[in-house]
Amino acid sequence: MAKSRNEPGNIELPGFSDTLQLTPKIDKPHYAGHRDRLKQRFRDTPDALADYELLEMLLFRAIRRADTKPLAKALLMRFGSIAEVLAAPEKLIAEVPGAGPTVAHELKLVEAVAKRSARSTVMEREVLGSWNKVIEYCTAAMAYETREQFRILFLDKKNKLIADEVQQTGTVDHTPVYPREVVKRALELSATAIILVHNHPSGDPTPSRADIDMTKQLVNAAKALNITVHDHVIVGKHGHASFRGLGLI
């Protein structure tokens, strides 16, 4: 059926027999301008952005047509900080309302890139001369894990890092460590020194009695085969503890 000339959206101009069709103006969604402004603020002063704003921007790729601010705030409310959001298990991230598998996968990808970047700053370097970088890497890799991990940094005779391996993963407050296996692996890699690292999911890096006893056993087992244990570092959300710094090695 032909559209009436008197219907809304049609305009008749004097001297013209045809009717002009006007296309209604479509407003951009409110979040479109917000995203542009947030990106510009990031370019100008990235350090001035709040944690939830940085997380908003991380979510842009996974959520292309919606406001990401509510989800960013919900994730921080659920897990506590950006670091804890990224370290959270993928399944738990996906369970946050508005997240789902795509968001969870995207955030775990960001975490993997961050860990790889931190690791690249210590590989093939003289580790003892780059100690702050080592601590930064271990903190990024382990401090926010929900279960204890026991990691070993294997060094050559020049104290360069030749391998970085997670030896064991345990429970929330315990990781089984077998000195014989640690020493065996060091010999396989021709390592002449090692640095022991594990995390405390509680956040408190204070060594336990069990940590101290296990370290003594490991030091003795390594010493028998001329392998030096430079340090045992415990990392947590609230800092780190060095056995050598505490006089425990």
From Swiss-Prot:
Q: Which residues bind Zn(2+)?
A: H198, H200, D211
Domain of life per record: Bacteria
MPN domain: which residues?
127-249
Q: Which Gene3D superfamilies match?
A: 5' to 3' exonuclease, C-terminal subdomain (1.10.150.20), Cytidine Deaminase, domain 2 (3.40.140.10)
One Gene Ontology term from the biological process aspect of the record:
proteolysis
One Pfam family, short name: RadC
Where the record places motif JAMM motif is: 198-211
Write the record's keywords in alphabetical order, separated by commas.
Hydrolase, Metal-binding, Metalloprotease, Protease, Zinc
Q: Which cysteines are joined by disulfide bonds?
A: none
What molecular function terms (GO) are annotated for this protein? metal ion binding; metallopeptidase activity
Report the sequence similarity comment from the record.
Answer: Belongs to the UPF0758 family.
| Designated name of the protein | UPF0758 protein Oant_1909
- Which organism encodes this protein? Brucella anthropi (strain ATCC 49188 / DSM 6882 / CCUG 24695 / JCM 21032 / LMG 3331 / NBRC 15819 / NCTC 12168 / Alc 37) (Ochrobactrum anthropi)
